[in-house]
Amino acid sequence: HINHANWLCLSLLTREGHITSHHISVSIESKPRHTLRPLAVFVRIFTRAMPKYKLSYFPLRGRAEAIRITFAVAGVEFDDILVNPEEWFTKLKHSGLSPSGQLPILEVDGTVLTQSKAILSYLAKEFNLAPKGNLQQAQADSLAHVVNELETTLTEAYGEKDPERKEKGMKTATEEVIPDKCGYFEKILSANKNGFFIGEKLTYADIVVFTFLNSYFMKGKAEGIPEGLKKFPSLSAWYERVRTQPKILEKLKNPTDGFVDYIY
């Protein structure tokens, strides 16, 4: 039997305009023969099993947190595997778990995806969080690549072993690179005028930029607008708009257990 809501959709598929809301259930056996095929297609679509998702990353926000938030926004469950860094570098890195030898990876019914921004782009399309059209999707990808550059800049500076070079690299990142990119984000938001980076609704471009700024300035906390953003009015208003999205706010208030502090 098919429930009331699905039956209304089914009546459109079978072009039976005389069907009313009183027809709340139907047996496949009772349908005319010519309607069985679209009915079968409909049933397959609505009963298709959700893929099994397994995300593997270190116990950090880092490059996986935007993926976690994307799952939260979509309301989709996934296995969040927190990989012990020592075990990764001594055993797992060359075990074949990750084809690229890097994390994060996302397993989708056994198929392994690598590169965090490619994973985000895939999930956005799956969860209706991608912008409309190829041009807007390219704009979203561009913003994701900007964030990837910021992450790389911070990671390289933070991981520098020479103390003087590390201090210089971190100073350049915090005083020059990040403010410059915040100015870039400000210009895009001011030009769009719809409250989000692309179009009129939340997309993965908003998620990836927000996650980086929240992780860098607020260490993943749910509190209000970071001081470092307050000189950018459009960016500040956008940050608060995204932060207070119910599912994002809930995720920020309930971070993954086992996280260790990191630069972002």
Q: Each predicted region: which residue ranges?
A:
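GST-like domain detector, emphasizing the conserved glutathione-binding G-site
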Residues: 46-172, 176-182, 191-193, 197, ...
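Carbohydrate-binding/catalytic loop surfaces
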Residues: 164-167, 256-264
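GST superfamily/GST-like fold recognition
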Residues: 140, 197-223, 231-236
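Surface-exposed helix-capping loop/turn segments at secondary-structure junctions
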Residues: 129, 187-200, 222, 245-252
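Short, Lys/Arg-enriched N-terminal segments with co-localized hydrophobic residues
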Residues: 25-49
